[in-house]
């Protein structure tokens, strides 16, 4: 079961098989309504940030997050959970004398949504094969990797180049999703990076946020170049609770 424990390091793929599918299972083990953080939940937070700050550059508006460490090349260097608990549902960096860039950050109660450690982003599959076609989960379908079954193709493709997000696609059924279709060398548009591997001959999945050495590329950094079976010492997960409302 995936849990958030104050004073403990986030789980990583260093010692555990934290693939996207396994993170999904660990979240579901918490009970009804619990699932892995998804592209749809991310979009809600992005829009809230944009409305509140008139910007998508979370690092400049809220705090850099844990992104300026020097990597040791061998361990999970993520900082422990809970440093921003004193902020409640507020926003900002660690109130206990933290150094911006080397301490936890929180936006509306979501701690280290960017920086610290990559987290898997669920309910989005990317069919690379020279196209980077984006598929998102349809309500009621089974959530799975490496498939289009139960997923809807959006009317645009994930960016074919790495860089700072400079344009987003619009799908009439999912206008809320801010998935980058273009990238540039300038961070003035959103301040958020995008990574891709569109020549890969198969399906790819997404990660969010960046890690402890990500620097200014962190934020709502979308990495769309991982295979579903990937695990690493800087990959983790984030759980999400979706209220179970019955419709009469």
Task: Describe every region a protein language model picked out.
Residues 1-113:
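Short aromatic-cysteine micro-motif
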Residues 1-34, 121, 127-160, 164-165, ...:
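Extracellular adhesion/carbohydrate-recognition regions
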Residues 40-43, 47, 67, 71-80, ...:
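C-terminal, surface-exposed recognition/capping segments
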Residues 50-52, 59-60, 132-136, 222:
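Surface-exposed beta-strand edges and their flanking turn/coil or helix-capping segments
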Residues 54-56, 139, 226:
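Short, low-complexity, polar/charged sequence segments that are solvent-exposed and flexible
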């Amino acid at each position: 079961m995936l849990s958030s424990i104050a004073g403990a390091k986030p789980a990583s793929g260093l010692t555990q098989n934290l693939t996207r599918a396994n993170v999904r299972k660990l979240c579901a083990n918490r009970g009804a309504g619990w699932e892995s953080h998804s592209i749809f939940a991310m979009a809600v937070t992005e829009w809230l940030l944009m409305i509140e700050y008139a910007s998508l550059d979370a690092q400049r508006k809220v705090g850099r997050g844990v992104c300026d460490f020097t990597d040791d090349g061998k361990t999970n260097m993520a900082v422990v959970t809970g440093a921003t608990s004193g902020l409640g549902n507020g926003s900002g960096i660690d109130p206990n004398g933290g150094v911006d860039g080397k301490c936890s950050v929180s936006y509306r109660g979501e701690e280290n949504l960017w920086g610290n450690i990559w987290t898997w982003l669920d309910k989005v599959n990317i069919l690379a094969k020279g196209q980077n076609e984006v598929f998102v989960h349809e309500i009621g379908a089974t959530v799975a990797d490496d498939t289009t079954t139960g997923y809807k193709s959006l009317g645009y493709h994930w960016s074919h180049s790495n860089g700072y997000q400079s344009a987003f696609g619009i799908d009439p059924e999912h206008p809320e999703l801010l998935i980058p279709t273009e990238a540039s060398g300038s961070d003035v548009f959103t301040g958020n990076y995008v990574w891709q591997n569109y020549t890969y001959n198969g399906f790819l999945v997404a990660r969010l946020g960046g890690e402890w050495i990500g620097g200014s590329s962190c934020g709502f950094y979308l990495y769309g170049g991982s295979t579903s079976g990937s695990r690493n010492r800087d990959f983790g997960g984030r759980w999400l609770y979706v209220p179970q409302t019955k419709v009469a």
